[in-house]
Design a protein with these regions (language model features):
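Sec-dependent N-terminal signal peptides
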Residues: 7-13
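Beta-strand cores of secreted/periplasmic/IMS beta-sandwich domains, seen most often
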Residues: 52-69, 92-99, 104-105
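Extracellular/periplasmic metallocenter environments
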Residues: 22-26, 35-40, 88-121
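C-terminal motif of bacterial Sec signal peptides marking the signal peptidase cleavage site
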Residues: 15-19
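N-terminal edge beta-strand
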Residues: 30-60
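Bacterial N-terminal signal peptides that target proteins for export
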Residues: 1-7
Length: 121
Protein backbone atom coordinates (compact mmCIF):
# COMPACT_ATOMS: atom_id res chain seq x y z
CA UNK A 1 0.00 0.00 0.00
CA UNK A 2 2.87 2.39 0.75
CA UNK A 3 4.26 1.89 -2.75
CA UNK A 4 0.96 2.98 -4.36
CA UNK A 5 1.00 6.21 -2.31
CA UNK A 6 4.70 6.93 -2.94
CA UNK A 7 4.47 6.87 -6.75
CA UNK A 8 1.74 9.57 -7.02
CA UNK A 9 3.58 11.64 -4.38
CA UNK A 10 6.82 11.52 -6.39
CA UNK A 11 4.98 12.37 -9.62
CA UNK A 12 3.21 15.30 -7.97
CA UNK A 13 6.52 16.60 -6.62
CA UNK A 14 8.14 16.35 -10.08
CA UNK A 15 5.24 18.21 -11.69
CA UNK A 16 5.40 20.91 -9.01
CA UNK A 17 9.10 21.57 -9.58
CA UNK A 18 8.71 21.46 -13.36
CA UNK A 19 5.98 24.11 -13.16
CA UNK A 20 8.23 26.30 -11.00
CA UNK A 21 11.10 26.29 -13.51
CA UNK A 22 12.38 29.52 -15.00
CA UNK A 23 10.70 30.99 -18.04
CA UNK A 24 13.29 31.43 -20.80
CA UNK A 25 11.18 33.93 -22.75
CA UNK A 26 13.40 36.84 -21.60
CA UNK A 27 16.54 35.18 -22.93
CA UNK A 28 17.65 36.68 -26.24
CA UNK A 29 17.38 34.13 -29.02
CA UNK A 30 18.33 36.09 -32.10
CA UNK A 31 14.79 35.66 -33.43
CA UNK A 32 14.01 39.38 -33.16
CA UNK A 33 13.22 41.24 -36.37
CA UNK A 34 16.24 42.97 -37.89
CA UNK A 35 16.80 46.55 -36.77
CA UNK A 36 16.42 48.79 -39.83
CA UNK A 37 18.77 51.79 -39.91
CA UNK A 38 18.36 54.37 -42.68
CA UNK A 39 21.63 56.04 -43.73
CA UNK A 40 21.90 59.00 -46.11
CA UNK A 41 25.24 60.04 -47.59
CA UNK A 42 24.89 63.15 -49.78
CA UNK A 43 27.42 65.90 -50.62
CA UNK A 44 29.81 64.79 -47.84
CA UNK A 45 27.10 64.81 -45.16
CA UNK A 46 26.15 61.59 -43.35
CA UNK A 47 22.99 61.00 -41.34
CA UNK A 48 22.75 59.58 -38.80
CA UNK A 49 26.03 60.85 -37.40
CA UNK A 50 27.24 59.05 -34.26
CA UNK A 51 23.74 58.07 -33.13
CA UNK A 52 23.44 55.23 -30.59
CA UNK A 53 21.23 52.31 -31.62
CA UNK A 54 20.24 49.60 -29.12
CA UNK A 55 20.10 45.95 -30.22
CA UNK A 56 19.23 42.72 -28.51
CA UNK A 57 22.03 40.17 -28.46
CA UNK A 58 21.83 38.17 -31.69
CA UNK A 59 19.62 40.75 -33.44
CA UNK A 60 20.59 41.45 -37.05
CA UNK A 61 20.78 44.88 -38.68
CA UNK A 62 19.58 46.04 -42.09
CA UNK A 63 21.13 49.27 -43.37
CA UNK A 64 19.16 51.14 -46.04
CA UNK A 65 21.82 53.36 -47.58
CA UNK A 66 20.95 56.23 -49.94
CA UNK A 67 24.26 57.54 -51.31
CA UNK A 68 25.31 59.95 -54.04
CA UNK A 69 28.36 57.78 -54.85
CA UNK A 70 29.59 54.24 -54.06
CA UNK A 71 31.38 53.58 -50.79
CA UNK A 72 31.72 51.28 -47.80
CA UNK A 73 30.49 51.00 -44.25
CA UNK A 74 33.10 49.58 -41.86
CA UNK A 75 31.83 47.55 -38.90
CA UNK A 76 34.33 47.31 -36.04
CA UNK A 77 33.55 44.09 -34.16
CA UNK A 78 35.70 42.11 -31.72
CA UNK A 79 36.95 39.97 -34.60
CA UNK A 80 38.37 41.26 -37.86
CA UNK A 81 35.37 43.47 -38.51
CA UNK A 82 33.31 43.66 -41.66
CA UNK A 83 33.17 45.85 -44.74
CA UNK A 84 29.76 46.47 -46.30
CA UNK A 85 30.04 48.03 -49.78
CA UNK A 86 27.17 50.11 -51.14
CA UNK A 87 26.40 51.51 -54.59
CA UNK A 88 25.30 54.93 -55.75
CA UNK A 89 21.57 55.20 -55.14
CA UNK A 90 19.73 53.02 -52.63
CA UNK A 91 21.38 49.85 -51.29
CA UNK A 92 20.23 47.35 -48.67
CA UNK A 93 23.06 45.97 -46.53
CA UNK A 94 22.45 43.05 -44.19
CA UNK A 95 24.61 42.67 -41.10
CA UNK A 96 24.41 39.49 -39.04
CA UNK A 97 25.84 39.98 -35.56
CA UNK A 98 26.84 37.24 -33.17
CA UNK A 99 28.56 39.45 -30.64
CA UNK A 100 28.63 39.59 -26.86
CA UNK A 101 27.02 42.60 -25.20
CA UNK A 102 28.99 45.76 -25.86
CA UNK A 103 29.42 48.53 -28.41
CA UNK A 104 30.25 48.32 -32.11
CA UNK A 105 31.16 51.32 -34.28
CA UNK A 106 29.89 51.53 -37.83
CA UNK A 107 31.72 54.18 -39.84
CA UNK A 108 32.53 55.40 -43.31
CA UNK A 109 35.90 56.76 -44.40
CA UNK A 110 34.62 59.04 -47.17
CA UNK A 111 33.73 61.17 -45.36
CA UNK A 112 35.46 60.00 -42.16
CA UNK A 113 32.40 59.70 -39.87
CA UNK A 114 31.04 57.33 -37.23
CA UNK A 115 27.58 56.62 -38.63
CA UNK A 116 26.12 54.71 -35.67
CA UNK A 117 27.26 53.12 -32.44
CA UNK A 118 25.47 49.79 -32.00
CA UNK A 119 24.82 48.95 -28.34
CA UNK A 120 24.25 45.22 -27.89
CA UNK A 121 22.41 44.31 -24.69
Amino acid sequence: MRRSIAIPAVLATCLFFAACGEDDSDTPTGDADPKVIEVTIQDGTVTPNGERVRLEQGQDVEFLVDADKPGELHVHTDGEGQTLPYNQGVSTLDLALDEAPGQIEVETHDPDVVVVLLEIR
